[in-house]
From Swiss-Prot:
Protein name: Small ribosomal subunit protein uS13
HAMAP family (alphabetical): Ribosomal_uS13
Database matches in NCBIfam families: uS13_bact (TIGR03631)
InterPro entries: Rbsml_uS13_C, Ribosomal_uS13, Ribosomal_uS13-like_H2TH, Ribosomal_uS13_bac-type, Ribosomal_uS13_CS
Assembly and binders: Part of the 30S ribosomal subunit. Forms a loose heterodimer with protein S19. Forms two bridges to the 50S subunit in the 70S ribosome.
Region spans: Disordered: 98-122
UniProt-recorded Gene Ontology molecular function terms: rRNA binding; structural constituent of ribosome; tRNA binding
GO CC entries: cytosol; small ribosomal subunit
PROSITE patterns reported for this sequence: RIBOSOMAL_S13_1 (PS00646), RIBOSOMAL_S13_2 (PS50159)
Family of the protein in this entry: Belongs to the universal ribosomal protein uS13 family.
Keywords on record: Ribonucleoprotein, Ribosomal protein, RNA-binding, rRNA-binding, tRNA-binding
Its job: Located at the top of the head of the 30S subunit, it contacts several helices of the 16S rRNA. In the 70S ribosome it contacts the 23S rRNA (bridge B1a) and protein L5 of the 50S subunit (bridge B1b), connecting the 2 subunits; these bridges are implicated in subunit movement. Contacts the tRNAs in the A and P-sites.
Transmembrane regions: none
Organism encoding this protein: Jannaschia sp. (strain CCS1)
Name of the encoding gene: rpsM
Lineage of origin: Bacteria, Pseudomonadati, Pseudomonadota, Alphaproteobacteria, Rhodobacterales
């Protein structure tokens, strides 16, 4: 199994599909990486030489924020919004939808399970 950015990528899959197992690399980025390194998109990971895997690893390290770094950057951006006290930061702080969705009904994913209110039965 090849390790790229700390992730064991599957060897039986095609290279662009296997690269999407790394957080921060989607289909478009994976295809761009293959093109930049000069690897055919129809090849499978187990057909790659060690030099090709190393070239992919170096290209990703140089040009992409992936895995822990990407998660840390996202969390720092959210923390910055919360510290600023802007509207988006307040919505994050209160665990409510941030992008303008309605909350009178719905928004259960963000708000969590419904809380029972005493004296509501009749």
């Amino acid at each position: 199994m090849a390790r790229i950015a700390g992730v064991n990528i599957p060897t039986a899959k095609r290279v662009p599909i296997a690269l999407t197992y790394v957080t921060g690399i989607g289909h478009t980025s994976a295809a761009a990486i293959c093109e930049a390194v000069g690897i055919d998109v129809t090849r499978r990971v187990n057909e790659l030489s060690d030099a090709e895997v190393l070239a992919i690893r170096e290209h990703i390290d140089a040009n992409y924020a992936v895995e822990g770094d990407l998660r840390r950057e996202t969390q720092m951006n959210i923390k910055r919004l919360m510290d600023l006290g802007c509207y988006r930061g307040l919505r994050h702080r209160r665990n409510l939808p941030v992008r303008g969705q309605r909350t009178h009904t719905n928004a259960r994913t963000r708000k969590g399970p419904a809380k029972a209110i005493a004296g509501k039965k009749k």
